[in-house]
């Protein structure tokens, strides 16, 4: 029985800028919302959160001032370019416990095999922030949380054959790893306004927040199979010659 740490996902990275950006993430929300009727916009992921926190708002009247029923175009009263920063924190690991067995037949054939049980856990938290100067909106933040965990199983087999003392022939087989994984995702958006009176909705905006539903999904994953073979020829005290191939 052996235990192996296959991967370590612990990391933290991001960026921070002390100069104004060329655009805002609000520009993306406006583009993404274009053509989507207002009665469907709340279900549009992050753009739906932007709608719920008043970062984007429907254009409710046409050029002649007539009301539009269920509008599908949007604008924003937030102008100018913001300071921007982002931070990503990742945690987790992948490991494997292997149960193996080997046998020797007359020092001619050596066989080994094992069953590997893998476990995987991964968490990612992304935080993106914008800060505006002299705007109705002071700051906006977006937090996205992703959690993945699951287990997997694989098989491996190795064979060495010695037809004569100075020749070794080898074969190895690594099965795919079959994973069963569970994933959870949610996002939260917070917009902090400077007590801005939004006439269209007759509301004074302060701290506005919105949260997506918790999205849960279960799925399977299979990694590639690996097969290999090789031969080694021993040349006495002069060394050896070896050749291997994997596919």
Which residue ranges define each predicted feature?
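Outer-membrane beta-barrel porins/channels
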Residues: 2-247
């Amino acid at each position: 029985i052996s235990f192996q740490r296959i991967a370590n996902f612990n990391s933290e990275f991001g960026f921070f800028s002390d100069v104004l950006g060329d655009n805002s993430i609000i520009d993306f929300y406006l583009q993404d919302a274009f053509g989507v009727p207002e009665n469907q916009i709340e279900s549009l992921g992050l753009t739906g959160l932007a709608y719920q926190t008043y970062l984007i708002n429907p254009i409710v009247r046409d050029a002649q001032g007539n009301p539009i029923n269920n509008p599908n175009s949007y604008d924003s009263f937030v102008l100018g370019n913001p300071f921007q920063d982002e931070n990503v924190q990742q945690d987790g690991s992948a490991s494997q416990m292997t149960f193996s067995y080997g046998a020797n037949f007359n020092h001619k054939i050596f066989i080994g095999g094992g069953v590997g049980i893998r476990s995987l856990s991964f968490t990612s938290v992304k935080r993106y922030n914008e800060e505006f100067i002299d705007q109705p909106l002071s700051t906006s933040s977006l937090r996205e949380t992703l959690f993945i965990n699951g287990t997997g199983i694989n098989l491996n087999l190795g064979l060495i054959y010695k037809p004569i003392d100075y020749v070794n022939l080898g074969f190895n087989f690594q099965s795919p790893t079959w994973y069963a994984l569970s994933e959870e995702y949610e996002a939260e958006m917070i917009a902090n306004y400077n007590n801005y009176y939004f006439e269209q909705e007759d509301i004074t905006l302060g701290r506005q927040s919105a949260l997506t539903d918790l999205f849960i999904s279960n799925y399977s994953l299979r990694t590639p199979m690996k097969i290999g073979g090789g031969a080694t020829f021993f040349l006495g005290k002069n060394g050896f010659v070896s050749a291997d191939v994997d596919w």
